[in-house]
Amino acid sequence: MICYELPLNERIRMLLRLEDLFDKIDFFSARDTSFEHHAALVALFEILDVTSRSDLKSDLLQELDKQRTMLEGLQDNPGVSEKALIHILQDIRAAFRGLLDIPGRIGGHLRDDEWLMSVKQRMSIPGGACEFDLPAYHYWLNMAPDARRADLQNWITPLTSIRSGINIILNILRNSGTKFCYIAAKGVFQQAGSEHQAHLLCLHISDEISCIPEISANKYALNIRFIPWRSDHKTEVCEEDVPFELTFCSL
């Protein structure tokens, strides 16, 4: 099965983007080549750009506090695992404290590093990080992999609380969902928007079906069209009926 996630507001969209970027840093920084560590640094700079355009810290604190209050209200509920509840509450409180401890703007330690910012500025130019443009960066890329990895870890570590908060919120969101099985007749599915309210849609489709979903949703309607994955025509729709699973997730 292939999962397609569609965020239905800008806040969730940003959290998903940041989750993806943090995962890329993990993947590339764990490897040894200079190309992979360059890719990790590119992802780190993208995190800096995404977080600079929002009050992410305040949003995370507000949502974590909301979830903590809701979960604390379930402590005497016999239908809820006490062990699991204690664990998630501990994670929320730890992430909350970590966010409060972040001084100033998110990524301030990166913005204060003149060398890093000079590299970031050149990277914004297509092909701008060549050795003749950035000899000091070329030197860094030729350092031992463990030395580069240690630098990457030092730059990423101050963002740990941000990542923890994002992971907690997205985990709660995804696990809140109600799953339904549908069939898109001749590749088209429509539903009144009032039937299910959600902040995130998770659509699962068999990887044997060579179609991709094109989803549009608002408070009035949900429309899904399954189109051939390499279609040259935007109006082309899969001709067969397409079974799929759809999960409506809300905070």
UniProtKB/Swiss-Prot annotation:
Q: Which GO terms describe its cellular component?
A: cell division site; cytoplasm
What are the entry keywords? Cell cycle, Cell division, Cytoplasm, Septation
Protein localization: Cytoplasm
SUPFAM superfamilies per record: YacF-like
Quick check: keyword Repeat in the entry? Answer: no
Predominant localisation class: cytoplasm
GO terms, biological process: division septum assembly; FtsZ-dependent cytokinesis
Which family does the entry's similarity section mention?
Answer: Belongs to the ZapD family.
* Function of the molecule: Cell division factor that enhances FtsZ-ring assembly. Directly interacts with FtsZ and promotes bundling of FtsZ protofilaments, with a reduction in FtsZ GTPase activity.
Query: What PANTHER family would the database entry show?
Result: CELL DIVISION PROTEIN ZAPD
Describe its partners and assembly state. Interacts with FtsZ.
Q: Which HAMAP family match?
A: ZapD
The protein's name in its UniProt record: Cell division protein ZapD
Organism of provenance: Nitrosomonas eutropha (strain DSM 101675 / C91 / Nm57)
